[in-house]
């Protein structure tokens, strides 16, 4: 390593975030920022990639990168195996946090709230538009469980392909969506000298309240 970690930094000077720019509803601002990210971010960055943090029954945190697959006025939707580690964690503690980071825009969004399963109909609707390989994978992979090796996984895939050789796979009961119902959404815009802009929205008594946080 030619540069020490202590010396690795960059200054953020692209933009600012003033209250005058921020709507009263955080979903409006998220849609604006997400549209900017879709137009601006380039591979390997995926605009809908986010870090999802969960907490297990023993209070230990876990995080991983997932893809956002749905957004409406209710909340933010992602899909997974309900029997996976994250599914078990959400069953034990149905609260989570998401973080989106768009480096080209020098922006970050943090979202916190309760998580609930979406309807079976909504899960099936998304499942049916996935590529065939992904639909088969939802049946084949015992997500988060220990397996002997890659060969075992490939064997499970072949068995699943044979099972559905004459029919289209349907959405398994152990697979589906979760929706995070936000209680807090923070918008972060990088600024020079680490004096970043942070606008925080809190859902209180059925209404969104906006406040500025110190960087």
From Swiss-Prot:
Q: Which reaction does it catalyse?
A: pyridoxamine 5'-phosphate + O2 + H2O = pyridoxal 5'-phosphate + H2O2 + NH4(+); pyridoxine 5'-phosphate + O2 = pyridoxal 5'-phosphate + H2O2
Where do the annotations place substrate binding? 9-12, 69, 126, 130, 134, 194-196
Alphabetized InterPro entries for the sequence: Pyridox_Oxase, Pyridox_Oxase_CS, Pyridox_Oxase_N, Pyridoxamine_oxidase_dimer_C, Split_barrel_FMN-bd
Residues that hold FMN according to the record? 64-69, 79-80, 86, 108, 143-144, 188, 198
Tell me which UniProt keywords the record has, alphabetically. Flavoprotein, FMN, Oxidoreductase, Pyridoxine biosynthesis
EC number(s): the record gives 1.4.3.5
GO MF: FMN binding; pyridoxamine phosphate oxidase activity
Per the record, the pathway is: Cofactor metabolism; pyridoxal 5'-phosphate salvage; pyridoxal 5'-phosphate from pyridoxamine 5'-phosphate: step 1/1; Cofactor metabolism; pyridoxal 5'-phosphate salvage; pyridoxal 5'-phosphate from pyridoxine 5'-phosphate: step 1/1
Class of enzymatic activity (EC top level) = oxidoreductase
Instruction: Describe cofactor binding as the record notes it.
Output: Binds 1 FMN per subunit.
Q: Name one Pfam family in it.
A: PNP_phzG_C
Which cofactors must be present for this protein to function?
FMN
Oligomeric and partner information: Homodimer.
Instruction: Indicate the family of this protein.
Output: Belongs to the pyridoxamine 5'-phosphate oxidase family.
Biological function: Catalyzes the oxidation of either pyridoxine 5'-phosphate (PNP) or pyridoxamine 5'-phosphate (PMP) into pyridoxal 5'-phosphate (PLP).
Which protein is depicted?
Pyridoxine/pyridoxamine 5'-phosphate oxidase
The source organism is Pseudomonas putida (strain GB-1)
Gene for this protein? pdxH
């Amino acid at each position: 390593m030619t540069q020490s970690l202590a010396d690795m930094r960059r200054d953020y000077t692209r933009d600012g975030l003033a209250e005058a720019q921020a709507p009263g509803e955080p979903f409006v601002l998220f849609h604006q920022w997400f549209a900017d990210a879709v137009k601006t971010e380039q591979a390997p960055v995926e605009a809908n990639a986010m870090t999802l943090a969960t907490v297990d029954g023993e209070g230990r945190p876990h995080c991983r990168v997932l893809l956002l697959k749905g957004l409406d006025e209710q909340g933010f939707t992602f899909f997974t195996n309900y029997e996976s580690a994250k599914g078990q964690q959400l069953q034990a503690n149905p609260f989570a946090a998401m973080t989106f980071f768009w480096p080209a825009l020098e922006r970050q969004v943090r979202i916190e709230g309760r998580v609930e399963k979406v309807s079976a109909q909504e899960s099936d609707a998304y499942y049916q538009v996935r590529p065939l390989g992904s639909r088969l994978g939802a049946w084949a992979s015992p997500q988060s469980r220990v397996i002997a090796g890659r060969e075992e996984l490939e064997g499970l895939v072949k068995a699943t392909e044979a099972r559905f050789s004459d029919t289209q796979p349907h959405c398994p009961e152990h697979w589906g969506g979760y929706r995070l119902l936000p209680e807090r959404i923070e918008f972060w815009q990088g600024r020079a000298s680490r004096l970043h802009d942070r606008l925080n929205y809190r859902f209180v008594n059925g209404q969104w309240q906006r406040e500025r946080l110190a960087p």
